[in-house]
Each structure stands twice: as C-alpha cells, then as structure tokens.
C-alpha cells in the first residue's frame, strides 16, 4: 500500500523530468498558439484529483454504478454553471474532447451519407467539419464553403447559394483559423430557408462568447459544441449545448452512443473553469485578449507583414509569410528557435501542402493570461518581424532571443504546481 503515497518524482523520475522540462518551456517561451492557454492552479488541482478513481456511466441520478452521490454533485455543478455562463437550455459536459462532442452532435441529428455544409479546412474550418481524412468526411457527404479570394471573408450569399443547391440536412459553422466575426443569425436564416439544422462549433471563441465579446450562437443554433480549453481557459475537454427538445437524443448519443464512462476529474476541472468564467475578472481578461489581438495585428502590419483578411475581430490572426520569402513551416521553426511558439497554418487558396503551408496562426489568450497588454504586443510584433524579415541573420536572431527573455522575465508563469510542491 505504500505506493499510494509516493511522489511522482520518486515513482517515475523520467516522466517527472519531462514534465519539469515542459514547465520550463512554457515559462521560457512566448506562447502564441491560438488554441493554447494557461489554466489556473485550481483547475489543475481538480483535474489531477482522486476523482479519476470513480466510474460514473450515465447521468447524475441515473448512474450504472453505485457510490456516485458526490460525483453527481460535481457534474450537476458543471452543468448548472455552463448553462448560466452561456444561457443555454441544456448542456452535456461529458464529451472527452471537441472532436467527440462534434461526433456526438452529428450522430444525434444525421444518418451516414447525409449532406452537410461545412467550412473548408483550408479556409479556416476544422478537421471535423468534413475533411476527407476525418470521420466526418468519411461518414457524411460534406460540401464545403469558404472565403472570398479578395476579402478573405465568408460570403453569406454564396453560402446560401450552396445550401439552396445541395439542400443539406445540417449547416456547420465555426472555425479553427478564421479571424472575423461569424454571423450566426444570418446562417440560421439560411438554414431555415433550406430546412437544415444549424450546428455551431464555437471551440475557439467560447471565452469571447461567454464574456459577451462575440455574438452568441446559442439563440440560433440547434446544437452548439465547444472545447473547454482555448479561450475558455479550462481543462482539455468538450461540451455540447442544445435546445431542450434535443436534450434526450444528445445525452443518449454521448452515452452510450460514442463514449463510456465520463472523466469525472476532468468534469470537476470544467466546473471550476466555468465558475472562474462567471467572474467579472474573466470578462476583463477576455476584453484584454481582444484588445491585445487587435494591437498585435496592427503592429504586425506596421512591421510590413500581411495579415489574412487585413486584421482580426477575435483572439487570433493569420500571417501570410510568402511576402518575406518563407513558408509557414520555416517561419514556425525560426520563431521557435528564439523562444516564440506559433503554428504553421494554411491560408485561403494556399499553394503549399498542409505540412508546409504559407502562413502562421497567432493568438493572444496565453500571453494575456500572463498579464501582457497592448505595450507588450508591440514588443512581440517587433520580435516576430525581426526574425521573419531576417531569416538568415544570426545576430538579429540573438537580439530577438534576448528581447524574448527580457519580456518573459517581467511576466513570470506559475510559482509552484501540484505535482512538484
């Protein structure tokens, strides 16, 4: 029994060492990946708790296992907080990920082979919105809509034309790399016109929606999915919201349809994150995320870099690196070497392969969590431009790396974490 009380560093020093190095990486690099954030210690404590021991198939009050009275409290708190946060009629907090939330939503409303309209991955959509390499593109007949070549924004009239032509059973909205506001009301009107369900995947913008800084899809969509990390700043996981009339089929599709037992430690962490998101401080944080994104976009443009669609309305932006003679892959590598983490990303009408790309995606949630504001965005833009415009100049790279260290020293990340107290 003594093994129950041993510390991680004593039981598995190899894993402990890898975790220590990852903590150092997070502390010592400027995190600009739009889908990443830094959760609170409270969220980590819930996620790394003894709740991982408990099986709880089913829903609160209707479990297939005994001893669930306390995890029922946990899940009910998560559900009630999520409904309050987003003003939803019904929520299921059990999906293990955003992809599984999307799978459950599809399976609740569609049959294999049904036609679905979704945003093209290459134009900012997501793998689960119909990519042929994903289950969504294999099980359903997806027709893609995208952005215009000149504006690099969604043309809703063209979405309507596609919907009118193909008569989809469902229209999917939401994106993983679209820097502009999505008009859910307009998409609902299109869906109603052709008799389609409207599903919204708000994984990237959920935090902004919760804070009232992006129009909410909840009043318009039949079903809404999200992750709980990214801008929502919770643990990695998924959630599904829907109208009350669809509650039973959504719940049944999550379990036993696509999942077994829920991860109660993760649901506890979701509940903690939802409580944090209900605070006035969270809205202030989200406002700063948006302010920082706009500031960073403007500063990058001042540095001579081209932004897809000319800027951003949310937490992220896409930089076209072709004008500086780079690929997205090379730009990502160069920035990583001096301490700035981004991801290569396809841009609309990209001539490069998905493994190379012509762009990089940049987001502000994580740096905002560290406490950075508009002034620091100007510094970051200068660092990025210094490297991308001088890809072979090692002196410039050393200068950029020094600037990164100086900036991060002013914004320390995490004192102690639960695993290494």
From Swiss-Prot:
Under the heading InterPro entries, the entry gives:
PyrdxlP-dep_Trfase, PyrdxlP-dep_Trfase_major, PyrdxlP-dep_Trfase_small, Ser_HO-MeTrfase, Ser_HO-MeTrfase-like, Ser_HO-MeTrfase_PLP_BS, SHMT-like_dom
Q: Name one GO molecular function term.
A: glycine hydroxymethyltransferase activity
In this chain, the site described as Plays an important role in substrate specificity is at: 229
Q: Which SUPFAM superfamilies match?
A: PLP-dependent transferases (SSF53383)
Enzyme Commission number, as recorded: 2.1.2.1
Q: Which GO terms describe its biological process?
A: glycine biosynthetic process from serine; tetrahydrofolate interconversion
N6-(pyridoxal phosphate)lysine found at? 230
Residues binding (6S)-5,6,7,8-tetrahydrofolate are: 121, 125-127
Q: Which enzyme type, at the first EC level?
A: transferase
Q: Which GO terms describe its cellular component?
A: cytosol
Q: Where in the cell is it found?
A: Cytoplasm
Q: Which reaction does it catalyse?
A: (6R)-5,10-methylene-5,6,7,8-tetrahydrofolate + glycine + H2O = (6S)-5,6,7,8-tetrahydrofolate + L-serine
UniProtKB keywords? Amino-acid biosynthesis, Cytoplasm, One-carbon metabolism, Pyridoxal phosphate, Transferase
Q: Which cofactor does it need?
A: pyridoxal 5'-phosphate
Q: Does the keyword Nucleotide-binding apply?
A: no
Under which pathway is this protein filed? One-carbon metabolism; tetrahydrofolate interconversion; Amino-acid biosynthesis; glycine biosynthesis; glycine from L-serine: step 1/1
Amino-acid biosynthesis among keywords = yes
Predominant location: cytoplasm
The similarity comment for this entry is:
Belongs to the SHMT family.
According to the record's subunit comment, the protein's assembly and interactions are: Homodimer.
- Known role: Catalyzes the reversible interconversion of serine and glycine with tetrahydrofolate (THF) serving as the one-carbon carrier. This reaction serves as the major source of one-carbon groups required for the biosynthesis of purines, thymidylate, methionine, and other important biomolecules. Also exhibits THF-independent aldolase activity toward beta-hydroxyamino acids, producing glycine and aldehydes, via a retro-aldol mechanism.
- Can you say what this protein is called? Serine hydroxymethyltransferase
Species of origin reads Carboxydothermus hydrogenoformans (strain ATCC BAA-161 / DSM 6008 / Z-2901)
